[in-house]
Amino acid sequence: LKAQDYENQKVHVVKKLDKDTTELMLFAKHGYAHSLLDKMLQKNRVTKRYFALVHTSDQLKQSAEIQVPIGRKDGSIIERAVVDAEHPTAKFAHTSYEIVKTQAHFTLVDIQLHTGRTHQIRVHFAHLGAPLLGDDLYGGKREKISRQALHCHFLSFKHPITEQEIMLESPLPQDMQALLENA
């Protein structure tokens, strides 16, 4: 920002980091651009793709769409679960994925969110019997990694002013890469 002579301007965080998830960060240099980008996120006009290391499961297909509702797990204010559509907290959730690489005990999947529900990826993959490595809230084991093995590696959106298509990519973080190389 110093190089662009923006050092005295306020920078606005558009995309916040989720706890225990590595991801691309999105910032706006102006308040107006921030509000436009925030609305784009709310209306699912930002494409987000994630890499996840999940426990290998027979229920995983080479590629698939997961379209089941998610709601609060009964008796919890934190946990979510796949619920019936009639459940009072049910919200439609849509995730698509493709297997990138399968190891003996875990699988690397490339995931696209079509909706943005709380814990959506974690709940959908736990529902398939393939919880994320390190995700002890939803059944993943922490013996190989100390956090949930989830990384937002791709963001795509139209610039809020120029409407130019912006695509951002980030490689796998060191801890996830090491697991793949040492399996």
PLM regions with names:
Residues 1-183:
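RNA pseudouridine synthases
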